[in-house]
Amino acid sequence: MQADWGIVGLGNPLAGDDGVGCWLAERLRKTFPSRWIHDLGADMLKIQALQPYPKQLILLDALRSGAKPGSLHYLSEEKLLQSPTTAAAHGFGLKGTLGLLRQTDDAFCKIKREWRLIEVEQIHQPFVLSPTVQAGAEQLFKQLQ
């Protein structure tokens, strides 16, 4: 049965704030265990093993755009792909991964997708979120409940 909505978290939890999408997905999955919520880590292509997809998908990830750390960004996929910050994304890179999914996965193309991103402060060790990014993640967590 196809879920009405779902959430995936993306990022590298071993790289500080870059793991904020995974952190949020894990927290939401514990809060809503029966919902379609998954932590994909740094490999967005793993989503193909999770079919059937929900009708609407919220993708959670980190962003480095120069805005205040912890700031929340709501971007369309097209606008995100135009951003120069996508070069250091996950796996093949965000553009490559989305391009591959769009070319090979008809079901993925039919999903309504929304990106919710949190501005990072640091992407390195230690393996914890910085306080400002955690505050932004807490704010987004409350919005998604």
Residue ranges and their predicted role:
Residues 1-122, 127-138, 143-145:
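N-terminal catalytic or cofactor-binding beta/alpha core of small enzyme domains
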